[in-house]
Curated annotation (Swiss-Prot):
The keyword Iron does not apply. The gene is dtd. An aminoacyl-tRNA editing enzyme that deacylates mischarged D-aminoacyl-tRNAs. Also deacylates mischarged glycyl-tRNA(Ala), protecting cells against glycine mischarging by AlaRS. Acts via tRNA-based rather than protein-based catalysis; rejects L-amino acids rather than detecting D-amino acids in the active site. By recycling D-aminoacyl-tRNA to D-amino acids and free tRNA molecules, this enzyme counteracts the toxicity associated with the formation of D-aminoacyl-tRNA entities in vivo and helps enforce protein L-homochirality. It comes from Aliivibrio salmonicida (strain LFI1238). The lineage of its organism: Bacteria, Pseudomonadati, Pseudomonadota, Gammaproteobacteria, Vibrionales. This is D-aminoacyl-tRNA deacylase. One of its GO terms (molecular function) is tRNA binding. Its EC number is 3.1.1.96. The keyword Heme does not apply. GO terms for biological process: D-amino acid catabolic process. Homodimer.
Amino acid sequence: MIALIQRVSEASVRVDGEITGEINQGLLILLGVEREDDEAKAKRLVERVLTYRIFEDDEGKMNLNVQQVNGSVLVVSQFTLPADTKKGTRPGFSKGANPIDAERLYDHFSDLCDEKLTTQRGRFAADMKVSLVNDGPVTFWLQV
């Protein structure tokens, strides 16, 4: 399971022109679900993402996590993250989970986040328009 996390001052996602999720300070989490992923991996990744210290403390050091700054998260499914890009000029998607399992694990990941802090979501498998102001910019790729 892959999370591309971005520290944001604001982020939103729209489907058919309607906002489905919107946050201020926090993390935009683009989530890619791979074939071998399960609930245990989702739980480990949530714990890692929510405790990852990428927010600045009073001394300007990245020493605080999203919970410590009372931030929120916006979780957006991103089936392209597990793509195989090693050769050729077209990505392969055989490493990604099938849509039924991917949606179930996306929902599970989002529900686990929601137990800890305010969580907004995109819409699984929809054509989404994601807007964000990346604060830094600060972006990390986390994988379990």
